[in-house]
Amino acid sequence: NEFVIPLVSFITPFLPDISIPQGASTAYAESLLKEFHGEWEFDKDKKLMLSPNVTTDWISAIYNAQKTVWNGLDIKIPVLAMYSDNSVNGNKWSIEFMHGDAVLNVKDIAKYSQNLGNNIQRLKVVGGMHDLLCSKPEVRNRVYRFVFKWLSTISC
């Protein structure tokens, strides 16, 4: 990824609409859905089991936004950045998908969230899935408690 994404971003002005698959794994969706290993029900026509293809233009936009964050922002309002304590990879479902982020690199979130501004509260959620509030009840209850406590400390 450290070479492919910048390369895709470089060719985007010339080939903005090339469709790129994101993979063929349904493992994360299986972690959420009650019919597999999760506890949730949702419309699979709206929240797909497989991630849809993206375009070179989309990848370039994400990469450029990430570079902006890497270089630092100066957000003046309080920011709460929450992320799991580990990332999970793989094409086949395993129990690890129930306790980690199968979408994002949590090390990058931990590293770069501090670049958002001067009033950043970060929460590393032990055992959190990508959708933290879809994690197991004990995990999401900890997240809710933290969010409400944090909200009570900020003034709008």
Predicted features and spans:
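Active-site-adjacent alpha-helix of alpha/beta-hydrolase-fold enzymes
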Residues: 90-120
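Acidic beta-to-alpha connecting loop that harbors the catalytic carboxylate
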Residues: 85-88, 100, 128-129
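Conserved active-site and cofactor/substrate-binding residues in soluble primary-metabolism enzymes
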Residues: 53, 57, 104-107, 142
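Alpha/beta-hydrolase-fold enzymes
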Residues: 1-54
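Short amphipathic alpha-helices and their capping/turn segments at secondary-structure boundaries
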Residues: 12-17, 67-76, 114-115
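Catalytic active-site module of serine/aspartate enzymes centered on a nucleophile-bearing elbow/loop
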Residues: 110, 116-156
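Short beta-strand/loop motif that positions the catalytic acidic residue
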Residues: 75, 81-83, 96-97
